């Protein structure tokens, strides 16, 4: 152990020689002693000490104190002297001497100075420490004495990791620690303990400023990057980047980019999984082969994933009509075009080459009204064929017409019934259809129910009219007048009377039939045959009896 000794102290050999010279033969036989108090004191560096030298010799001379320290005689008397030692900075030995009866007697005391360390510092920790690998704690201690009582302790939180004595000056104490997830964010520190308890002073503790450790786990696998293979100019598409087994995921840095264009990513973490989502929007100046890059950085290490992406421009297809609304009989040109490298097909007819338009002509007829023309466009991008379709509708202007198949020219209806005149007109612009009775301004509704009577009988002019002309169809309504209600009522009455008469006649005949036939008399009576009544006889006369 190295002990700090002030430069003003004499070499130990010189002191030994001085003590030997002061001792005279026969000193061991003296019966009086010289006491030095306090004996072997301990005090902090730079402190003061009051020393008393005394003897029981009745004929002692002046007591002297020999020391390299700064001293001052405070008081003295017969057989004693008091001194004050100031600015005691190092260990020292003091010697008191006096002559008693011509002989020199001496007494000594060893002063021990303790000093707290001037610097206790834990060396900086690595910015990031991978979990499962060792790292070294290093504590440096300057100053502090006595070294035999000085111990250095390395701590995690309040847990002791290592306890070692401070040996050299300056002292350096190290400990090897295996990094774990639990060490992330943990404070590490260094503490010195100067144990002066055996000297009755106590335990003096100095602690360094703590240093925080950050541990991490970064898998060797790259992130999973989900991005489109193709992206059209001025369109957007979501991009996702995910990495599992990351710790601490919340402290990872994510960089997402389309080429040299950094994407604004939203980063979320759940447990040890990190997910970054961004929207990639392609610019016109990025057309061609590009890369989507996802870069995850943690603990000074990086994991990266890349995906190829092609930015393309797909204009069209655009379908045009020379006349969107064409008169019947006119010539209409239909054309379809798209961007460069795009192959277009118009109503099944392909263009001569990619990038060229497709055309067709037609003579507009009534059947072409509302006809749709379809154009398909195909673009090849890195071996993939992309398709788009477009269409346009042609309107043809033609005069009004009435469909004879749906509008009967002769109608035979009964009086006082409800019917619908089913007639439809067509044309572009759509015509107005009216049916007026000849010789009058009477109009019958078309397409809605109405009540028919004999006044509707006659010939009607059904006319469809528009800005393109007029079309007339003759419709004849034949209304059958119904017979009088008296005849069926009279017939019903006669039938009723006939039925009643027949019923009464049948009832009479049935009753008379019950009254005719033979009668039975009592057994004691004489049997008399009945005779028929003569027509000339009265109803009340009895028949004559034979004598």
Curated annotation (Swiss-Prot):
Instruction: List the ranges whose topology is Extracellular.
Output: 30-485
Task: Write out the topological domains of type Cytoplasmic.
Answer: 511-547
In the UniProt record, the signal sequence range is 1-29
* MF terms in GO: integrin binding
| Listed GO biological process terms | cell adhesion; cell-cell adhesion; phagocytosis
> Keywords in UniProt for this one?
Cell adhesion, Disulfide bond, Glycoprotein, Immunoglobulin domain, Membrane, Phagocytosis, Phosphoprotein, Repeat, Signal, Transmembrane, Transmembrane helix
Q: Where in the cell is it found?
A: Membrane
What Pfam families does the record point to? ICAM1_3_5_D2, ICAM_N
Q: Which superkingdom?
A: Eukaryota
Expressed, tissue-wise, as follows: Leukocytes.
Q: What is its main location?
A: membrane
Q: Which residues are glycosylated?
A: 52, 84, 87, 101, 110, 134, 206, 264, 295, 308, 320, 363, 389, 453, 457
Q: How does it get modified post-translation?
A: Upon stimulation by a physiologic stimuli becomes rapidly and transiently phosphorylated on serine residues.
Domain Ig-like C2-type intervals = 46-103, 132-197, 234-301, 329-382, 416-469
Q: How does it sit in the membrane?
A: Single-pass type I membrane protein
Q: Which GO terms describe its cellular component?
A: plasma membrane
Keyword Signal among record annotations: yes
Q: Which Gene3D superfamilies does the annotation name?
A: Immunoglobulins
Covalent S-S links between cysteines: 53-96, 57-100, 139-190, 241-294, 336-375, 423-462
Which spans are transmembrane here? 486-510
Q: Which family does it belong to?
A: Belongs to the immunoglobulin superfamily. ICAM family.
Task of the protein:
ICAM proteins are ligands for the leukocyte adhesion protein LFA-1 (integrin alpha-L/beta-2). ICAM3 is also a ligand for integrin alpha-D/beta-2. In association with integrin alpha-L/beta-2, contributes to apoptotic neutrophil phagocytosis by macrophages.
* Subunit: Interacts with moesin/MSN.
Which protein, by its recorded name, is this? Intercellular adhesion molecule 3
């Amino acid at each position: 152990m190295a002990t700090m000794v002030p430069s003003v102290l004499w070499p130990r050999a010189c002191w030994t020689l001085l003590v030997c010279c002061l001792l005279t033969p026969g000193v061991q036989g003296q019966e009086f002693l010289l006491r030095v108090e306090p004996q072997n004191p301990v005090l902090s560096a730079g402190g003061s000490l009051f020393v008393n030298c005394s003897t029981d010799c009745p004929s002692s001379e002046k007591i002297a104190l020999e020391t390299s320290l700064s001293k001052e005689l405070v008081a003295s008397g017969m057989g004693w002297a008091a001194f004050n030692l100031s600015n005691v900075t190092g260990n020292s030995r003091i010697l008191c001497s006096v002559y008693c009866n011509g002989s020199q007697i001496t007494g000594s005391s060893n002063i021990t100075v303790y000093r707290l360390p001037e610097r206790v510092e834990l060396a900086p920790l690595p910015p990031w420490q991978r979990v499962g690998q060792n790292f070294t704690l290093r504590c440096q201690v300057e100053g502090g004495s006595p070294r035999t009582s000085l111990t250095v302790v390395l701590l995690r939180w309040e847990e002791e990791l290592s306890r070692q004595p401070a040996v050299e000056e300056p002292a350096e104490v190290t400990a090897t620690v295996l990094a774990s997830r639990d060490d992330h964010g943990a404070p590490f520190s260094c503490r010195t303990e100067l144990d002066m308890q055996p000297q009755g002073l106590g335990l003096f503790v100095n602690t360094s400023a703590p240093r925080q450790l950050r541990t991490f786990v970064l898998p060797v696998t790259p992130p999973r990057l989900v991005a489109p293979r193709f992206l059209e100019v001025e369109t957007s598409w979501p991009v996702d980047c995910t990495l599992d087994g990351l710790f601490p995921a919340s402290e990872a840095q994510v960089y997402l980019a389309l080429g040299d264009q950094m994407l604004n990513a939203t980063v979320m973490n759940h447990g040890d999984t990190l997910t970054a989502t961004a929207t990639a929007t392609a610019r016109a100046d990025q057309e061609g082969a590009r890369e989507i890059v996802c870069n995850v950085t943690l603990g000074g290490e990086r994991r990266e994933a890349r995906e190829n992406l092609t930015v393309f421009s797909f204009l069209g297809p655009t379908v045009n009509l020379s006349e969107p609304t064409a008169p019947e009989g006119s010539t209409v040109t239909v054309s379809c075009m798209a961007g460069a490298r795009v192959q277009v097909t118009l109503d099944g007819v392909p263009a001569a080459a990619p990038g060229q338009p497709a055309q067709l002509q037609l003579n507009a007829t009534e059947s072409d009204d509302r006809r749709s023309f379809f154009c398909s466009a195909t673009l090849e991008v890195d071996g993939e064929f992309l398709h788009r379709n477009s269409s346009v509708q042609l309107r043809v202007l033609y005069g009004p017409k009435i469909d004879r198949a749906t509008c009967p020219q002769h109608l035979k209806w009964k009086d006082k019934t409800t019917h619908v005149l089913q007639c439809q007109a067509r044309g572009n612009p759509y015509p107005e259809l009216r049916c007026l009775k000849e010789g009058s301004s009477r109009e019958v509704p078309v397409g809605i129910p109405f009540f028919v009577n004999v006044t509707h009988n006659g010939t009607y002019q059904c006319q469809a009219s528009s800005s393109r002309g007029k079309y007339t169809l003759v419709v004849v309504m034949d209304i059958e007048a119904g017979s009088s209600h008296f005849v069926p009522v009279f017939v019903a009455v006669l039938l009723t009377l006939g039925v009643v008469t027949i019923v009464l006649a049948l009832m009479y005949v049935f009753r008379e039939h019950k009254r005719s036939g033979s009668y039975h008399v009592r057994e004691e009576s004489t049997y008399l045959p009945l005779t028929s009544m003569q027509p000339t006889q009265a109803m009340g006369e009895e028949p004559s009896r034979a004598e």
